Amino acid sequence: MLNIILPSLPYQRTVDPMWQEEMDVARGCGYSVCLFDAEQEKLYHQPNVAYPTLYRGWMLSEVEYQQLAHMTSLLVSTEMYLASHQANGWYDSITGFTPRGSIVAAGAAGVSVEFFLKQGGRCFVKGISKSFGSESVISSGAEFEALLQKHEVASKDLLFIREFVELSSQPEQRFFVVRKGAFGAAEAQLPETLKPALGALKNRWFYTVDVAYTQTGQPVIIEVGDGQVSDIKEWSVAELYSKVIHRLAELAA
């Protein structure tokens, strides 16, 4: 059994409509559902202390997650959350399975940008937990400076500078991982060549691995994320709960 914490509307004891389906499915599975208002730093409906508690909702900053963790004991600790949510928590562990990159403060990132531009003519720039959308792909130092200015990136903010890899048209897949067990939508299997990466990430309870394929058909890990704040992408909510959350509840019991 689990307690599931979902986002409420700001200043309201009502689930955010974007998470209504998850609330319905979670309750249908017999889980206790609580609501968290990040704006007020308020938790509605205290979780049952006899059960582990899992957050499912919008991305939280380190401070916001700590605030939630202070209100109730969470299955995923703040340290574990950040280790999956931020690139500096996972990149070094799986360098052989993901495109090359460098994590560096924005004020000192010019060298890394120049290096990757010389390598392939383009590079990918993102924050350690979020991309800049279509603007993340740049082809010059001037574009990099414009990106920093537009998004008001401070010189001390960490950036993830990555080589640009041409990918095939095959759709990217999101795998939810519970400990070392990876689950794909519609019974998709994690490629064998990427399974050793799960061993390098084994200290995490619940995370996601996004897999894409190069133009030569090689599978690569594009991103690791915390499973609590990851969108379901090609999954249905029902499948997520029947497979992934069910397994998580079994192991956490």
Regions found by a protein language model. Give the residues of each.
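Short, charged N-terminal beta->alpha structural module
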Residues: 2-39
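Active-site nucleotide/adenylate-binding loops and adjacent lid/helix of ATP-dependent enzymes
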Residues: 3-17, 46-48, 56-173, 177-195
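Glycine-rich, highly charged phosphate/nucleotide-binding loops
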Residues: 35-44, 59-61
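A long amphipathic alpha-helix within ATP-dependent nucleotide-binding catalytic cores
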Residues: 158-164, 170, 176-225, 229-252
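Hydrophobic, Leu/Ile/Phe/Ala-enriched alpha-helical segments that form helix-helix packing faces
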Residues: 22-30, 72, 94, 120, ...
